[in-house]
Amino acid sequence: MFSLKPPRPSFRSYLLPPAQTDDKISSEPKIKKLEPVLLPGEIVVNEVNFVRKCIATDTSQYDLWGKLICSNFKISFITDDPMPLQKFHYRNLLLGEHDVPLTCIEQIVTVNDHKRKQKVLGPNQKLKFNPTELIIYCKDFRIVRFRFDESGPESAKKVCLAIAHYSQPTDLQLLFAFEYVGKKYHNSANKVNGVSSGGGGVWSGAGSTGSQRTPLFETYSDWDRETKRTGASGWRVCSINEGYMISTCLPEYFVVPSSLADQDLKIFSHSFVGRRMPFWCWSHSNGSALVRMALIKDALQQRKIDQRICNAITKSHPQRSDVYKSDLDKALPNIQEIQAAFVKLKQLCVNEPFEETEEKWLSSLESTRWLEYVRAFLKHSAELVYILESQRLSVVLQEEEGRDLSCLVASLIQVMMDPYFRTITGFQSLIQKEWVMAGYQFLDRCNHLKRSEKESPLFLLFLDTTWQLLEQYPAAFEFSETYLAVLCDSTRISLFGTFLFNSPHQRVKQSTEFAISKNIQLGDEKGLKFPSVWDWALQFTAKDRTLFHNPFYIGKSTPCVQNGSRKSFKRTKKSYSSTLRGMPSCLKNGIITDQDLLPRRNSLVLKLKPDPPQHTDSQHSGAEQYFKEWFSRPANLHGIILPRLSGTHIKLWKLCYFRWVPEAQINLGGSIMAFHKLSLLADEVDMLSRMLRQHRSGPLEACYAELDQSRMYFRATGPHDTLGTPEFLSSSFPFSPVGNLCRRSILGTPLSKFLSGAKIWLSTETLANED
């Protein structure tokens, strides 16, 4: 039995503000058996009782008592105490309210107050003191803090070492997804959250049960349908890489110019880095195509092969137009610079005391260079949109390995040019096509195995640039920013095969080896089938998935009812609403100013450098005229959208970076208020439309069942509406920072305290690693 009041610590940790030792500390819980909820294949590796989870740093009256558990999937804090101050919780079905996936852990710090010792724990390290405090720094900017004042000293030490060991695996097959899938194959009847845990039928799951299937581009037919959808008549699906016989970092099927024979491709492949020969991404209706390729490493054959490839791409164009090559390695920042900018952004968002540097906040943000890089990728992609759309030239994105920057630029161009990729299903298919199947190295770039030298947040940068477009053109996107934030979080859950591997070949190879070691019979399957992140029902209820829908969205056609019959109302091609896209007071606010088109001093944003040389001056003036004309017209929400790049238009994605900071919350404020009101309005329109449609088909009560199938999270008052809306709305909605970040207990502080709080994210050099 432990006392009601823990001993007063004699050491004040500089990691966070000192723990409060007031007399109002929460009383001890009743001793009862607390058991975790485990997924198939998940096992508890260590646990400790009588742990106190700190909710705030300036008081301990809200702290929770419970059991801290480390499994092979997550750390979990189990308590019977209700979460204080929290009126809403957006729950992930795979994770409890106090759970953190092991692959989301950034840094582990143990502290002993009495001996004045602290240590950053790495894998296979020893801990020579008994910790009184454990601080978990997460990749999503959360901080979770536990106290062991009443726990057994040895038990506390063991659980800390277990967390450090299992959160930093050295082998891919040690990630939880393998145990999960292995368990599924041994017991095919297993289901998770009422949903089959198989990796077969994958659906977008963003709302209704009739959601369109997300193509995974693992088969010939998926690629064939995409070429037909885009009208790529001069291109064909190639199958020479079946079994990954040519390249281990390309998909088994991809699209190439029809004039290139398989035998030629096999010969050319040896000259490219990673054997990543040119492959098709997308085609414009005017015939221009977007192509990706790695560098040609054979200097002697470079000119010959390059000319042959360009000729083949030219022949695939209906007008036999020339090819424009963009060297991304020269035009954009590299992955190391992007990682350095993200580290600085992380430090700024959750580390710097705002009261001391309030007047320097914007300059500090600028010095991180994160927004500069966001602008650089948007700008470069917009310039290539001009080449594809106005110049009618095919564009080749060239990069050394062709699997980092080209993933981002190719995806961003397609989001700007093709409204299909601004729908939920289309966006998911884009990620499958340009990231997962094209060999983006999720394992290394997300640092699942703690190889920090290869880490770089390129996928997050893509989501950020997409959010910038969503913010500027809200009616052009079917999905919401909540969807983008949840998608970012899913990259840090070691369950989904979507974000777990460096290439499709690695998935097949590693999962086959694992299956053999576990005596799993694969049959005709190519490796184990891992759950797909697009099966959203595994993570969220149907009600919560409605938050993925954007109430601003204007679809291609909208159903309407006239005299009880349903008709289709076609919007004019140039639909426009001043509330959705304000016109600039002058053209200087758009993309066509000198500041936006030309690189400023000390900027990494360079002008396009085509190879071979082309008429750069005439193209520059043509691009300027193109952008002027485009911004002078109302936006076509069902066509091309271009970003505004001035300082006022490129913003920090607050929901992603500030959601766990209580001081950054605006109670009953932020974009959620407009989202809430528009959701109610959209739901009311949908409800009235459904009622009118069924007016002649049956009694009024017959339509009420359909009314429950609302696509909106916030619903207008209806006959069967009992859910209501959350009592607490803030700029962090639907995420609640309470209990996930040890900060001040007062929620909704003034904006002058926007980033105030504790010093965190200490480097190993900063800490005194005393043993």
From Swiss-Prot:
One GO cellular component term of this record is: cytoplasm
Q: Which residues does the record list as Phosphoserine (modified residue)?
A: S603, S745
- Print the keywords alphabetically: Phosphoprotein
Residue intervals of the Myotubularin phosphatase domain: 217-657
Phosphoprotein: is it a keyword of this entry?
yes
Pfam families referenced in this protein's UniProt entry, alphabetically: 3-PAP, Myotub-related
Q: Which family does it belong to?
A: Belongs to the protein-tyrosine phosphatase family. Non-receptor class myotubularin subfamily.
**PANTHER family, alphabetically?**
MYOTUBULARIN-RELATED, MYOTUBULARIN-RELATED PROTEIN 10
Q: What is this protein called in UniProt?
A: Myotubularin-related protein 10
Q: Which organism is it from?
A: Mus musculus (Mouse)
